């Protein structure tokens, strides 16, 4: 779950302290005692790249919609009352930054800024350089600790007391930073590069799957298809729709397509820019963040099947609105497809799991509000 700080300035103060304490403290008390000058310079270079990437992640605006933006006909028309303009696809209004953010990923407390289309490469490079620097330091500290342990029978004056104290303090602290940032970095790669999604869009995908498993999504998708593509309401498609609702139980991936996901390399080029600029501190993503290319599955073809029409719906395919719950007293009907058999069971409603999009939360306890989104503007 995203961290919420009582005093927002701590979001900058804590990382600044950790970078300074671990980085410069390790250099002064440990590395300067035995490491060669070229290796010390390399370490300081990595440390400087952390500072530069961090500064850019903090100070770079995550991206705001173009003035007088008009949405194309193939996306939902979402009007932001606070900005008094339409929101481009994948955009959300941040309640902290008080602006609509292009391809909003989340509001980061550690940068006091949103992570969005324009500064996502800076944020990812910031994480990358932390991992590189702490990994190098971890290896150096491990070798140094092993060396001191081998010489433990020597008199104490052979080693500086300050080095031993700092090794004791900084080694576990550095390992903790390395572990946590690596997990965050891998999550970013998994969401954005592997699946082409922001954290909010991954959350939305979980929400849609929850709606699908509870039997409340299919009807909404069919209704949206009739509304957006009225010409697709043929006799055969109506028959297929009835079968989906009463007999045939399609898989989730047969009805829901994330339109902005391509292969891994294309996703990386889209969000990080050309490959030769991935490590360049000022590298920017491809495009303007107001319009995004879509995969072939999302292309609408009038003569296609009902499933193809549903897959071509704009994101999110339910329009961001939750369909009516099929309630029977105080319970909820859930339908699942296991091993080719349709299972129907009655479940007691779970607080928050069958709520509207603005109040729904995932298995991590994350709601739309936790990502910094102004839910009143959704």
Curated annotation (Swiss-Prot):
PTM summary = Autopalmitoylated.
Q: How does it sit in the membrane?
A: Multi-pass membrane protein
Query: Might you name a Gene Ontology BP term for this protein?
Result: protein palmitoylation
Give the recorded effect for residue 108 to R: Reduces, but does not abolish catalytic activity. Lacks autopalmitoylation
The record's Gene Ontology cellular component field reads: endoplasmic reticulum; endoplasmic reticulum membrane; Golgi apparatus
Show the PROSITE patterns listed in the entry. Answer: DHHC (PS50216)
Q: What is this protein called?
A: Palmitoyltransferase PFA4
Source organism: Saccharomyces cerevisiae (strain ATCC 204508 / S288c)
Q: What lineage does UniProt assign to this protein's organism? A: Eukaryota, Fungi, Dikarya, Ascomycota, Saccharomycotina
The gene behind this protein is: PFA4
């Amino acid at each position: 779950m995203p961290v919420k700080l009582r005093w927002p300035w701590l979001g900058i103060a804590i990382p600044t302290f950790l970078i300074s304490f671990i980085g410069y403290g390790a250099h002064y008390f440990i590395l300067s005692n035995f490491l060669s000058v070229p290796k010390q310079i390399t370490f300081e270079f990595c440390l400087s790249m952390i500072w530069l990437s961090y500064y850019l992640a903090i100070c770079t605006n995550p991206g705001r919609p173009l003035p007088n933006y008009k949405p194309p006909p193939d996306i939902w028309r979402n009007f932001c009352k606070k900005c008094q303009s339409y929101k481009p696809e994948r955009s959300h209004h941040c309640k902290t930054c008080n602006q609509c953010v292009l391809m909003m990923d989340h509001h980061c407390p550690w940068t006091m800024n949103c992570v969005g289309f324009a500064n996502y490469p800076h944020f990812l490079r910031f994480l990358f350089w932390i991992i590189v620097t702490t990994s190098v330091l971890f290896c150096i500290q491990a070798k140094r600790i092993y060396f001191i342990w081998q010489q433990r029978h020597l008199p104490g004056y052979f080693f500086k007391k300050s080095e031993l104290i700092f090794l004791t303090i900084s080694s576990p602290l550095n390992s903790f930073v390395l572990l946590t940032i690596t997990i965050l970095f891998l999550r970013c790669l998994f969401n954005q590069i592997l699946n082409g999604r922001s954290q909010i869009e991954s959350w939305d995908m979980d929400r849609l799957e929850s709606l699908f498993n509870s039997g409340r999504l299919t009807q909404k998708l069919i209704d949206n298809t009739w509304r957006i593509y009225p010409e697709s309401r043929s006799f055969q498609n109506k028959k297929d729709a009835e079968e989906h609702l009463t007999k045939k139980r399609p898989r989730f991936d047969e009805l829901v397509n994330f339109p902005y996901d391509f292969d891994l390399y294309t996703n990386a080029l889209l969000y990080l820019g050309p490959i030769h600029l991935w490590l360049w501190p000022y590298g920017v993503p491809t495009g303007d963040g107001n319009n995004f290319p879509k995969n072939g599955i999302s292309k609408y073809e009038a003569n296609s099947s009902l499933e193809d029409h549903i897959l071509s719906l704009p994101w999110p395919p339910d329009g961001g609105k939750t369909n009516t719950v099929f309630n029977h007293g105080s319970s909820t009907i859930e339908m699942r497809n296991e091993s080719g058999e349709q299972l129907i069971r009655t479940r007691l409603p779970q607080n928050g799991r069958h709520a509207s999009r603005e109040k729904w939360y995932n298995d991590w306890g994350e709601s739309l509000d936790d990502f910094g989104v102004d839910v009143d503007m959704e």
